[in-house]
Amino acid sequence: GALTPVITPLQAAPARDSRRLQLEHLHTEEQLSLVYAIGNNYLPSATQLLDRFLRDHYSQEIGRIDLRLFDLLHQIQQILGCQQPFQVISGFRSPATNDQLRANGTGGVARNSLHMSGRAIDIRLAEIPLTDLRDAAMLLKAGGVGYYSQEQFVHIDTGKVRYW
């Protein structure tokens, strides 16, 4: 089969209060597993890798991802007691890509999408029911949660608390 690119930063053994994320991108087939924060400190080298990993997979444009989005993902994994990687459908989206997806009639693409400001991500977990993922995100009351059962993903963002 095809080789899957893996990005792995060199790191010391993780501290007790470290926060880790494991992601696999369904479009680029890249995988990433790293500690992105220790205590109140975000690790710039790790957040830069996350920004690149969650780039617009159509244009390759890299946006700056809201650090709170990483924490939401980490908290969801804690709630679900799950160690498996999040499967990423969409992270950052350039305005041009967003307009193109809207023009193509792709469902659920908002004109002022928070994907364009690095404040939204569309994800799923292979072994976890989509409804459980949605419920865990809603439990946090930390932003928007969209449930797309047909498309098999949950949208999570750091905007106003709202559900659809």
Feature names for model-found ranges:
Residues 1-11:
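N-terminal export signals
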Residues 19-24, 105-164:
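Catalytic cores and adjacent binding grooves of peptidoglycan-active enzymes
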Residues 35-89:
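Active-site acidic/histidine clusters and adjacent loop/turn architecture
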Residues 85-99:
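Acidic helix-start/capping segments at beta-turn-to-alpha-helix junctions
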